[in-house]
Amino acid sequence: FFIDSSRCTGCKTCELACKDYKDLTPDVSFRRIYEYAGGDWQEDNGVWHQNVFAYYLSISCNHCEDPACTKVCPSGAMHKRDDGFVVVNEEVCIGCRYCHMACPYGAPQYNAAKGHMTKCDGCYDRVAEGK
């Protein structure tokens, strides 16, 4: 999933598209948008000028080369596919949350209603179709 962060306005449409495609509940977000903003006002001969900025970062599972989440999963549910996507087999997952604790990006999320972990799967089905 490529995002040109220099063009990102923080509209969260990518986050909503993910939630819609995966039919996620309001409390679950596989993609999150972070904002970093700052700046100040400066006076120049009685005229005030703004010097403000905002940057946005769209974060999801990074499908790491050497994922920490897969190393701590006792059931083997969290695994890396041959195509590089890190996914959770929800039928095998025991919901121990070790993967969540190990992931530096907070990608695996516990779904209390399902009783197991869920996470971004990189839309590997769409990627396989060339979408």
Where are each of the predicted segments found?
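Non-ligating segments of multi-cofactor redox enzymes
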Residues: 1-131
